[in-house]
Swiss-Prot record:
This is tRNA uridine 5-carboxymethylaminomethyl modification enzyme MnmG. It comes from the Bacteria. It comes from Mycoplasma genitalium (strain ATCC 33530 / DSM 19775 / NCTC 10195 / G37). NAD-binding protein involved in the addition of a carboxymethylaminomethyl (cmnm) group at the wobble position (U34) of certain tRNAs, forming tRNA-cmnm(5)s(2)U34. Its main location: cytoplasm. NCBIfam families: mnmG_gidA. One of its GO terms (molecular function) is flavin adenine dinucleotide binding.
C-alpha cells in the first residue's frame, strides 16, 4: 500500500522531515511559499554551537541531512569549549548560506519521492479528528495520509524596524495568515513569539585592521561522522571580534523609543538567550561593553553578518550604532536589522512523537513549537518525519529518551513543559550531558538508526569493527600492569596498577601512552579521545547508567490513555492536573513532567500494580 505525507514548509524542519520520510519509500508533497527560499538561513550564517552542534551530529547518525549540508558548505569550523570538559564541547561552523540553500534545492530535485509544490496551505482536511489532507490557497486539495506542519516564523508574521511594521515573513518574503487562524479555530492554543536579526554590512567598507582576528587552530572537524574530507585550516574564512563602547550605549539608552522593542509595537516574548542589542544595553547597564562577532555570510555575497547586534531600531539609529564600532567608521549597510513577530503553538499539545493530541496523523515541528534555532528545528523535523512514517507503516513509534540524545531532551522539554519564550537547547538542560557528548554520537544512536533502516549496512559494519578494536584496547588496558610497559616502569611507584587505572590521572594522555603499546592498539585519535573520556569520567558515567536502568524500568510500566488520576490516593493536585492534561504513556515520561514528584510516581505505580 502506498502513502503520501504532506510537509508544509521547506526550512530546516521541513527539509529534514521530507528527506527522512522519503527514506521509508513514502511519497512526499513538500509545500513552500517561495521555491527561492527553500533551505534558506534568514538569520545567522552558521550551524552548531553548544548542545546544538551535538544535535546536528545526532541528526546525521539518524539519517538526516543537516550535517552533510553544513559540511558541504562550511567556511570555517571551531570546536567550542575545547579548554573545558568534554560534556560541553561542540562543533560550530560558519556556512555559506547561499551554497547551503542551493545544495538543498539540488538534493530535492534529485529525490524521486519528493514532489516540490510552490503554494500556500490555508486549511486542513479533517474527518473524525483524523487528518485527510490540506487545502491550498487556490482552492485545490492535497489528499494526504499524514501532514507535518513546519512553518517556521511565517504564521501571521510581522516585521518591525523602528516604527515601520509590515505583514511579511523573513527577508521580505510572503507570510501565511489563514493557516494559523484555522488551526486556532480547531482548538489549538497559540502563543505570540518574537526574534530578531542584525543589519548586514558591505564587507569592503570595513577596516579589519581595527578588529580582533578570531584565531582558529581547530583541525579535522566535521559534523558528519562519515565525513573525513576535512576543510584545511588555510582554506577557512576568518571571523573577527569587536566590542560595543560607552558612546554606543549612551546612544541606545537615549533613543530606546525608536526601537520597536521599546515603543510598544511588540508585545511578543523574545528569546531569553539571544536578546537584541538594545535589550542587552538596557538590562545589563553595568556591563561596559558587549561582544559583536563579524562573520562571513557567503562567498557569493558582498555582506557580513554581525552576531550579537540584532535590533529593531530605526535605520538612522542603526547606522549611527554601526559606525561607532571599531573599523566600521565608513560602514555601508546593505540591509537593516529588524524584529519579527509570529505565531507559535503550545508544544504541550503534542505527543512525544510530535503528533498533535487534537488531530490524528497531524504533526508539528520546528519554530511552530516555540523553539529557536536551525538545529532544534531540524531535529524536530527529523523525528516528526520518522514517526509519521512509522505510524503509517504500523510500526512502533521512535522516541528518544533524555539519556539517549539532546534531541530527546528537547522533545521531552517541549511536550512536558509550558513554553513562554523561544526555547533554545543548552547543555545545562541535559542531566546526562557527560554521556550526551559530541564524540560518542554513533555509539549512542547508530544501532537504533540501523534497525530503522536509516543507516546502511556498510556504515554500521565499519562502526562495529571500530567498536571491536576499541573494546580490545580497553580490555588490554584493564588487564595490563604499568610495570609491563618498559617506558612507564619508572614513572609510577605502583607498577602493579593497571594501565586503565593509570590513565585516570589527569596528567596522563592516552594518545601518548598508546605509542608504547603494540601496533594493533594504535587507534585513530578520535577513538582514543573517546576511550580516555570514558576512563577518566567512569564514576560519573556509571552513576548515570544506574539511573538510566531505573528509568528504563519505569518506561515498561504503561499507563492507559483513559487513566483517571483522581482515583490515586495521596496524589498532589498539581500532579493530577498536569498528568490528566498530558496523558503520559508510561511512568518514565510521567516522572519527567514538571510538577510531578517522586512520591507521586510511587503512588501511581502502587495503584497500577494493585488494580492490574
Amino acid at each position: 500500500m502506498s502513502f503520501i505525507i504532506t510537509v508544509i514548509g521547506a526550512g530546516h524542519a521541513g527539509l529534514e522531515a521530507a528527506f527522512i520520510v522519503s527514506k521509508f519509500n513514502i511519497k512526499v508533497n513538500l509545500l513552500v511559499l517561495d521555491i527561492n527560499h527553500l533551505g534558506s538561513c534568514p538569520c545567522n550564517p552558521s550551524i552548531g554551537g553548544p548542545a546544538k552542534g551535538i544535535v546536528t551530529r545526532e541528526i546525521d547518525v539518524l539519517g538526516g541531512m543537516q550535517a552533510i549540508a553544513a559540511d558541504n558548505n562550511a567556511l570555517q569550523y571551531k570546536l567550542l569549549n575545547s579548554s573545558k570538559g568534554p560534556a560541553v564541547q561542540a562543533i560550530r561552523a560558519q556556512i555559506d548560506k547561499i551554497g547551503y540553500k542551493n545544495w538543498f534545492q539540488s538534493q530535492v530535485k534529485l529525490n524521486k519521492n519528493i514532489n516540490l509544490i510552490q503554494s500556500e496551505a490555508i486549511n486542513l482536511i479533517v474527518r473524525n479528528e483524523k487528518i485527510k489532507g490540506v487545502i491550498l490557497k487556490d482552492g485545490s486539495e492535497l489528499l494526504s495520509d499524514a501532514v507535518i506542519i513546519t512553518t517556521g516564523t511565517y504564521l501571521r508574521s510581522k516585521t518591525y524596524c523602528g516604527n515601520t511594521v509590515k505583514n511579511q515573513g523573513p527577508d521580505q518574503s510572503k507570510n501565511s495568515e489563514k493557516l494559523s487562524t484555522n488551526l486556532i479555530n480547531r482548538g489549538f492554543k497559540t502563543i505570540r513569539l518574537k526574534t530578531g536579526t542584525p543589519p548586514r554590512i558591505l564587507k569592503t567598507s570595513l577596516d579589519y585592521n581595527q578588529m580582533e582576528l578570531e584565531i582558529n587552530n581547530n583541525q579535522n572537524l566535521a559534523f558528519s561522522t562519515t565525513n573525513k574530507n576535512f576543510l584545511p585550516l588555510e582554506k577557512q574564512i576568518p571571523c573577527y571580534l569587536v566590542h560595543t563602547n560607552q558612546k554606543i550605549h549612551d546612544l541606545i539608552l537615549k533613543n530606546l523609543k525608536k526601537s520597536a522593542m521599546f515603543n510598544g509595537s511588540i508585545s511578543a516574548q523574545g528569546p531569553l538567550y539571544c536578546p537584541s542589542i538594545e535589550d542587552k544595553v538596557f538590562k545589563f547597564s553595568q556591563k561596559p561593553r558587549h561582544q559583536i562577532f563579524v562573520e562571513p555570510e557567503s562567498l557569493s555575497l558582498d555582506t557580513i553578518y554581525l552576531a550579537g547586534l540584532s535590533t529593531s531600531f530605526t535605520p538612522e539609529i542603526q547606522k549611527e550604532i554601526i559606525q561607532l564600532l571599531p573599523g566600521f567608521q565608513n560602514a555601508e549597510i546593505k540591509k537593516f536589522g529588524y524584529a519579527i513577530e509570529y505565531d507559535a503553538f503550545l508544544s504541550n499539545q503534542l505527543k512525544p512523537t510530535l503528533e498533535t493530541k487534537l488531530i490524528e496523523n497531524l504533526y508539528f515541528a520546528g519554530q511552530i513549537n516555540g523553539t529557536s534555532g536551525y538545529e532544534e528545528a531540524a531535529g524536530q523535523g527529523l523525528m516528526a518525519g520518522i514517526n509519521a512514517a512509522l505510524k503509517l507503516l504500523k510500526k512502533p513509534p521512535f522516541i528518544l529518551q533524555r539519556n539517549e540524545a539532546y534531541i530527546g531532551v528537547m522533545i521531552n522539554d517541549l511536550v512536558t513543559k509550558t513554553i513562554s519564550d523561544p526555547y533554545r537547547l543548552l547543555t545545562s538542560r541535559a542531566e546526562y550531558r557527560l554521556w550526551l557528548r559530541n564524540d560518542n554520537v554513533q555509539e549512542r544512536l547508530i544501532k537504533k538508526s540501523f534497525e530503522l533502516g536509516l543507516t546502511d549496512k556498510k556504515t554500521y559494519e565499519l562502526f562495529l569493527k571500530k567498536e571491536k578494536k576499541k573494546q580490545e584496547l580497553i580490555s588490554f588496558l584493564k588487564n595490563t600492569q604499568v610495570g609491563k610497559v618498559k617506558a612507564l616502569k619508572f614513572t609510577n611507584k605502583n607498577t602493579a596498577q593497571s594501565l586503565y587505572d593509570f590513565n585516570k590521572r589527569s596528567e596522563i594522555n592516552l594518545d601518548k601512552l598508546i605509542k608504547d603499546l603494540p601496533e594493533k592498539y594504535q587507534l585513530d585519535s578520535e577513538t582514543l579521545k573517546q576511550i580516555e573520556i570514558e576512563i577518566k569520567y567512569e564514576g560519573y558515567i556509571k552513576k548515570n547508567e544506574k539511573y538510566f536502568k531505573g528509568l528504563d524500568k519505569l518506561s515498561k510500566i504503561k499507563i492507559p490513555h483513559t487513566f483517571d488520576y483522581h482515583k490515586v490516593k495521596n496524589l498532589a493536585s498539581e500532579a493530577i492536573f498536569k498528568l490528566s492534561n498530558f496523558k503520559p504513556s508510561n511512568l518514565a515520561i510521567a516522572s519527567q513532567i514538571a510538577g510531578v514528584n517522586f512520591n507521586d510516581i510511587i503512588a501511581i505505580k502502587h495503584f497500577l500494580k494493585t488494580y492490574e
